[in-house]
Amino acid sequence: MPDFLIDANLPAKIGIWQNQRFIHKVTLDPCWDDEAIWQYAKTNNLTIISKDKDFFIQQLLKGTPPKVVHIKFGNLKLNDFISVIENCWNEVELLLINHTLINIYSDTIEAIK
């Protein structure tokens, strides 16, 4: 069973995301809008991973579930993006145990309960 739903605006080919715990939106339904993604994640108890600030706002307004990992750094070369994610992912997963919203910046992580 997956634990994380990766939004369409993120690359699916990140090494640490290449296992059964992660599912990419385009493999479910590439036509889904944000509300469909939100409802699927909520129904299936998945954490949404996205750069889309709309999920950040929905999480603040609607609460959990689902939890949201919001990637809040600008466009990077793919290798740099992968490096940032791989360097912080273990901490992100630990923070998700007690937090509902995680903001990943290029140089820090912010966790909100």
Give names to the regions the model predicted.
Residues M1, N45, P65, N98-H99:
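A general structural motif
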Residues P2-T47:
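N-terminal first-folded block
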Residues G74-E110:
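C-terminal structural segments of small proteins and small subunits
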